[in-house]
Amino acid sequence: MLTLHLQDDDVAAIDAVADELSRRYDSVESTEFQAESRLYADELPRRVRRALHEYRSTEKSGILVVTGLPVDDSALGATPADRRHKPVPSTSLRQDIAFYLIANLLGDPIGWATQQDGFIMHDVYPVQGFEHEQIGWGSEETLTWHTEDAFHPLRTDYLGLMCLRNPDGVETTACDIADVEIDDETRETLSQERFRILPDDAHRIHGKAPGDESARESALRERSRQRVASALESPDPVAVLFGDRDDPYLRIDPHYMQGVQGETEQRALETIGAAIDDAMSGVVLSPGDIVFIDNYRVVHGRKPFRARFDGTDRWLRRLNIARDLRKSREARLAATTRVIY
């Protein structure tokens, strides 16, 4: 795990850029903001840019924690209780901008039409009625470790989580495939395209389509829903391990791989699952901390906790970050848009 501790002058420089942009934009969902964000990311301190560049290019570790950004708890207001809560401007606008710009040093933040109503900036907080679900709104059940959006060929390269509030010290669990030891036979099996992954529940909760969307957007949205339905009905077989044999990437989501494997495949999954459990570590994020997770190297999850639903619960912001937007061009409305259908 790599750590970047922001110094006072780093924070001052980031704040100056965030202040300027927060006067011009009231949301990071603005396409104009997204178009300019890369330019402003280049104005972040060289020390910050170097740390993110080295993390991206060297792959020395799949986890990078950035600490030191300020968060005024009183200015945030209550932790939202409803997943549709999206005020404009956000009470965390300055933090959102800083988070977005730092994420831009890894790639382009993206959203999903089938997840959180197509927003780029996601929320992670407990919602009543979802306590036992395997999604970001859950709380009382362990969020089983997984690759983010493992079922999807356009899954994110990096996942970013920024902590706004974590009064109970809830741990984000993580494990780098480089730390996992398995036998050669299991490795060989896992490297073959024999494993099926179902779409996770977050992609099955579809928001309401806007009434004024274009015919092309409607067509893309319907195709996206059909893809999820098809993946539920008959998921394509994929390899769990891929890339370099001795230093592989991985793609796995055990909770959504149960009951759809053959006996040999299931044994291989159980073997690597036990090895990942043995190598599992984690990080407890404090307000202002950001953790970046290489989604090709690291599985992540969350320890269980009991939510109070009183406005003081754990609250994170989340970004999915793509290294190459062109891979998803056929699934986006335009070259300038960031939502994948």
Swiss-Prot record:
UniProt keyword Oxidoreductase, yes or no: yes
Sequence segments annotated as region (Disordered): 203-223
EC number assigned by the record: 1.14.11.40
Superkingdom to which the source organism belongs: Bacteria
Organism: Streptomyces hygroscopicus
Disruption phenotype: Cells produce dideoxy-mannopeptimycins.
PANTHER family noted in UniProt: GAMMA-BUTYROBETAINE HYDROXYLASE-RELATED (PTHR10696), TAUD_TFDA-LIKE DOMAIN-CONTAINING PROTEIN (PTHR10696:SF56)
Molecular-function annotations in GO: iron ion binding; oxidoreductase activity
Cofactor remark: Binds 1 Fe(2+) ion per subunit.
Cofactor(s) in the UniProt record: Fe(2+)
Family membership noted in the UniProt record: Belongs to the clavaminate synthase family.
The protein's name: Enduracididine beta-hydroxylase
Lineage of the species this protein comes from: Bacteria, Bacillati, Actinomycetota, Actinomycetes, Kitasatosporales
Pfam families: TauD
Physiological role: Hydroxylates the beta carbon of free L-enduracididine to produce (3S)-3-hydroxy-L-enduracididine in biosynthesis of the nonproteinogenic amino acid beta-hydroxyenduracididine, a component of antibiotic mannopeptimycin.
Pathway: Antibiotic biosynthesis
